[in-house]
From Swiss-Prot:
The gene is Tubg1. Gene3D superfamilies: Helix hairpin bin, Tubulin/FtsZ, C-terminal domain, Tubulin/FtsZ, GTPase domain. Belongs to the tubulin family. Phosphorylation at Ser-131 by BRSK1 regulates centrosome duplication, possibly by mediating relocation of gamma-tubulin and its associated proteins from the cytoplasm to the centrosome. The modification Phosphoserine is found at residue 131. It comes from Rattus norvegicus (Rat). This is Tubulin gamma-1 chain.
Length: 451
């Protein structure tokens, strides 16, 4: 009984990474851009219906809802070869099409005005599922639509579907470059509050690290958005392979999440992927083995979140799940795990077991692959707090000077005061404190002393 998942794509970034994700899924399941199963795709052992449903004429349609407050990206999707793939009723563009102007408050208050139309689409999609497991939200936290409308939808999804899982793929802004969005720290922090309180699991896609990986590992001089988005879609599709090619473990979303998130608030995950090569020459000199893949996944340069080195805190892994695809002998997995533990290649929390889980997954039979084995690591690691600290520092600089506040004052939520910002700042600070506490043996009793 497959548990269905509805994908919500929000704003420019969300729709771009969502588009790449569906292109990748179609390729992996042998579905043409029009949604028709290719003639060679006769294996039949994959579960297409977790992410797709079939129309009356048998062609496949993504369980996706495309939302944006300005039309550019969605129009480009509708002018691509994949235009016929989507259900046109599941596309929502705001009528005045002016976007949210990179302003969280504008995205949030537009959410209040249009949420009924959006939830008509989401409810219809949910009613069409036999046993809906949850929602996956793709968005960025820096702009206006993905952050503001995204925050509003996260709150409402919790109210409307309290028992369904909400997982997000959240793109964090590139910290190495000057941003063209001056209010980015405000947008990010206000969204982080909702990601902390209203999501069950957040897969952090950090543009800073993705750019580094593209330049250092893939040798692309100035990586374009579409190249970065391909990296992201690789991660998204790899993290859902066990749902789409089910084995005996981790074949639903809750199974994936439960092994990684032992305590509810610490649910921000980082990912690593290997082997990352675009050129065939490297592929021909390296024999990818399970140990090789698992060891590489633990190297910081393969991790898609750039965290600063923090000398004071002894950061550690809370849990790791490695999804290994390809020709794998299960006994090799056991040996690799032993070797990782013996050599102490990973530093784990002092208050719980060293949890490294491995899920073996088949590769798509329809995609040629240069490597025998590839792996995705999803890790819950306390150093992710440094990403939030960076956002807080930038927020504090602007907040102290009350810079750019007038853009926010226009909206109802900030008309009288900026309490919402200050509460968000406190909640993110509590999250950072809890990640720091999780590195210490007394974490189990953390939070009980303060009451």
């Amino acid at each position: 009984m497959p548990r269905e998942i509805i994908t919500l794509q929000l704003g420019q970034c969300g729709n771009q990474i969502g588009f790449e994700f569906w292109k990748q899924l179609c390729a992996e399941h042998g579905i043409s851009p029009e949604g028709i199963v290719e003639e060679f795709a006769t294996e039949g052992t994959d579960r297409k219906d977790v992410f797709f449903y079939q129309a009356d004429d048998e062609h496949y349609i993504p369980r996706a809802v495309l939302l944006d407050l300005e039309p550019r990206v969605i129009h480009s999707i509708l002018n691509s070869s994949y235009a016929k793939l989507y259900n046109p009723e599941n596309i929502y563009l705001s009528e005045h099409g002016g976007g949210a102007g990179n302003n969280w408050a504008s995205g949030f208050s537009q959410g209040e005005k249009i949420h009924e139309d959006i939830f008509d689409i989401i409810d219809r999609e949910a009613d069409g599922s036999d046993s809906l497991e949850g929602f996956v939200l793709c968005h960025s936290i820096a702009g206006g639509t993905g952050s503001g409308l995204g925050s509003y939808l996260l709150e409402r999804l919790n109210d409307r579907y309290p028992k369904k899982l909400v997982q997000t793929y959240s793109v964090f802004p590139n910290q190495d470059e000057m941003s063209d969005v001056v209010v980015q720290p405000y947008n990010s922090l206000l969204t982080l509050k909702r990601l902390t309180q209203n999501a069950d699991c957040v897969v952090v896609l950090d543009n800073t690290a993705l750019n580094l990986i593209a330049t250092d590992r893939l040798h692309i001089q100035n990586p374009s958005f579409s190249q970065i988005n391909q990296l992201v879609s690789t991660i998204m599709s790899a993290s859902t392979t066990t749902l789409r090619y089910p084995g005996y473990m981790n074949n639903d979303l809750i199974g994936l999440i439960a092994s990684l998130i032992p305590t509810p608030r610490l649910h921000f995950l980082m990912t690593g992927y290997t082997p990352l090569t675009t050129d065939q020459s490297v592929a021909s000199v390296r024999k990818t083995t399970v140990l090789d893949v698992m060891r590489r996944l633990l190297q910081p340069k393969n991790v898609m979140v750039s965290t600063g080195r923090d000398r004071q805190t002894n950061h550690c892994y809370i849990a790791i799940l490695n999804i290994i695809q390809g020709e794998v002998d299960p006994t090799q997995v056991h040996k690799s795990l032993q070797r990782i533990r013996e050599r102490k290649l990973a530093n784990f929390i002092p208050w719980g077991p060293a949890s490294i889980q491995v899920a073996l997954s088949r590769k798509s039979p329809y995609l040629p692959s240069a490597h025998r084995v590839s792996g995705l690591m999803m890790a819950n690691h306390t150093s992710i707090s440094s990403l939030f600290e960076r956002t807080c520092r930038q927020f504090d600089k602007l907040r102290k000077r009350e810079a750019f506040m007038e853009q926010f004052r226009k909206e109802d939520i900030f008309k009288d005061n900026f309490d919402e910002m200050d509460t968000s700042r406190e909640i993110v600070q509590q999250l950072i404190d809890e990640y720091h506490a999780a590195t210490r043996p007394d974490y189990i009793s953390w939070g009980t002393q303060e009451q």
